[in-house]
Amino acid sequence: MSKLQQFPLSKGWSFRDNEATSEDAWMPVPVVPSVVHQDLQANNKLKDPYIGFNELEARWVNEKSWTYKTVFQKPAAPAGSCIVLAFDGLDTFAKVKLDGNVILENDNMFLARRVDVTKALEAEGDHVLEIDFDCAFLRAKELRKQDPRHNWASFNGDPSRLSVRKAQYHWGWDWGPVLMTAGIWREVRLEVYSARVADLWTEVQLASDHQSAQVTAFVEVESVHSGSHRACFTLSLHGQEITREEIGVTENGTAKATFDVKEPSLWWPHGYGDATLYEVSVSLVKEQEELHRVSKKFGIRTAEVIQRPDKHGKSFFFRVNGVDIFCGGSCWIPADNLLPSITAERYRKWIELMVHGRQVMIRVWGGGIYEDNSFYDACDELGVLVWQDFMFGCGNYPTWPNLLESIRKESVYNVRRLRHHPSIVIWVGNNEDYQVQEQAGLTYNYEDKDPENWLKTDFPARYIYEKLLPEVVQEYSPGTFYHPGSPWGDGKTTSDPTVGDMHQWNVWHGTQEKYQIFDTLGGRFNSEFGMEAFPHMSTIDYFVENEADKYPQSHVLDFHNKADGHERRIATYLVENLRTATDLETHIYLTQVVQAETMMFGYRGWRRQWGDERHCGGALLWQLNDCWPTISWAIVDYFLRPKPAFYAVARVLNPIAVGVRREHHDWSVTHAQPPKTSKFELWVASSRQQEIQGTVELRFLSVNTGLEVRERIVHENVSIVPNGTTNLIVDGLIDHTVHSEPHVLAARIWVDGQLVARDVDWPQPFKYLDLSDRGLEVKKISESEDEQTLLISTKKPVKCLVFEEREGVRISDSAMDIVPGDDQRVTIKGLKPGDAPLKYKFLGQ
């Protein structure tokens, strides 16, 4: 017998171009995991592809094949043990050779592989491990040619990508470069053991009154020789053991233990309670010797997607532990094109930003990867719900038998790997593949329920989403909701606003509607929508090397914006709404104002609709993050620098949020004639679970003078509906013949004497307003070793006061509207005494 030992093979690797045959062509690999672009950069063979036009200079890498090699010594293997070579991820077409003999051929980036090499390592001493990585870019083209009858309809990247189980964004997307990576992208190691815990998972039954729960822990054991193994299970909370049970392992290598938990501490998304994690451990024992020990954290909670007929159609919202959750959040793309460079610390910083921004759900998009364990660990610990796509995006995927088998293995592996995470509340079959079906006119008869028929149509991928994947989820994670696609709703058109989820791109893409009416364009769950904005100047400085290129329409800036037609779209929304500028810093700021306003109008209205029989169940903006320094829809850039939209969304998602808006007057289709009257509305949105009392004030303040133009409205002792919307004014009226000067509607709400939320509605568009000479004052009123408090006041209304984003500095709020008589405080952490104060900018400055 031997206790399981692991020997990471992270050092001592070298690599070379497959076409190079000389011994001096080998170059050292600093560390594995890595991909070839990282290793080429480390050897000064490649410039940073994220800077300038260097992506073009890296394109040669896309069409190359590579070999990685290392020499290792056979580990000591006691009698009765085996030696396994374990690969957690190979990218992608990999032929693995041990001492010249092929032991594995891989064609799926998303699949871990294990090879028993006990016999291959019988000889003592050194052994040579080589991995040939064939060019995925060229292999994909070959595979496409082999099936000319298949309709290769797709958006983004070369259509041949559909034939390869590799991160689809590597072929380029409308926010990312074409960087075809290859390499050992996740850990590789040797394992020596006589028996091991191959899998450990739990199934949880929570009583309806939440006073008790039943936790069943399951284990699968692999052993070299049969024998009387025993599994010692322990259940712990906060490091303290609650109970334990020892069970004999069956002949087929399984064991389970059931624990009754009284008064369990539940796992909640942040803002609703503690994200409590229990820990289940199993120790595999034989003859009193521990052979292997595995622990996993899990949560006790229920999670449902509620779909029921109502006056709006059919609902689509999430319920956790019996509580309806409005899921305000973001879509997530891979945080880097060079995936091994993302550390656990960087993942955690991203999720911490989500919490800081009051976002409760993150959608792992289907054109990237099944994320690293540390990503989901952070979501578990910080209470962020995960919408998890399977890795299919924007295409009509072929269904060759060998590809279907690979997809099944991939989905089984990843569902099993991730099923213990309480943060994952939904698995979704694909991203926008049903939209491709619609736009390409592919056959989709929802009433035909025979999967074999689907394979015979020109949309065979339906078989993956409506048979293969739901069967895997049902078998391996039966408590998790499965949804065939995003967007999708009961087989209806993907733009149907009455059912399922929808991607609303008629702001920016499509009909390019005014962002001021975004809330009228939504559906039951808005899982994509967005607006582009430039990142901050510090990020531009990173990838634009030449000062002469720092103007809004420079070639290098256009190169770093991969969205088709971005010039026209950005120009349209700027010219419609703002006084434009030609200097880069102001242009950056103006695009950020547009993005922040767009997100605010969408989120604010959709959250209000939550209170109307769950008309809108959630909103996930496109997108939270970037995979390289770029100009995109991200609200936080590659370097984790929030754009103003991040703060605008956070305010709308406040647990108690006040909202005010006047009806939209479309100036661009009325010859810019001003309206004679305007209706306005005032409401409160609350995610609190109990009714609370509050006081709401609405003031009407002149943009030009800062004075009140009419008597303020005050609602005292308002009963605020729990987890819903309280409408205070639905038929307010502004008579512009009486109140002709432009004015803002400034709303505030107090609860228990504390001012908890604000909202300011402005006359639209901003370009018609004179926003000069505001009388703004930003004053430091306290300072400690690493924290400052600023007091902000103004004589006239100020729009979108944005503070500089600086490395290591966190701001409590930004992108703020400031009005007279309502001083606001901002806390800055990480700014040391003596550091230069943060710069700031506001509209009209």
Curated annotation (Swiss-Prot):
PANTHER family membership: BETA-MANNOSIDASE
Glycosylation sites: 252, 717, 723
Active site: 432 (proton donor)
Stated family: Belongs to the glycosyl hydrolase 2 family. Beta-mannosidase B subfamily.
Alphabetical UniProt keywords: Carbohydrate metabolism, Glycoprotein, Glycosidase, Hydrolase, Polysaccharide degradation
Any one of the GO BP annotations: glycoprotein catabolic process
Reactions catalysed, as given in the entry: Hydrolysis of terminal, non-reducing beta-D-mannose residues in beta-D-mannosides
Record-linked InterPro entries: Beta-gal/glucu_dom_sf, Beta-mannosidase-like_N2, Beta-mannosidase_GH2, Galactose-bd-like_sf, Glyco_hydro_2_Ig-like, Glycoside_hydrolase_SF, Ig-like_fold, Mannosidase_ig
Function: Exoglycosidase that cleaves the single beta-linked mannose residue from the non-reducing end of beta-mannosidic oligosaccharides of various complexity and length. Prefers mannobiose over mannotriose and has no activity against polymeric mannan. Is also severely restricted by galactosyl substitutions at the +1 subsite.
UniProt-listed Pfam families: Glyco_hydro_2, Glyco_hydro_2_N2, Mannosidase_ig
Pathway: Glycan metabolism; N-glycan degradation
EC number(s) reported in the record: 3.2.1.25
Note: In contrast to clade A beta-mannosidases, which are likely secreted, clade B proteins appear to be intracellular.
Name of the protein described by the UniProt record: Beta-mannosidase B
Organism: Aspergillus fumigatus (strain ATCC MYA-4609 / CBS 101355 / FGSC A1100 / Af293) (Neosartorya fumigata)
GO MF annotation terms: beta-mannosidase activity
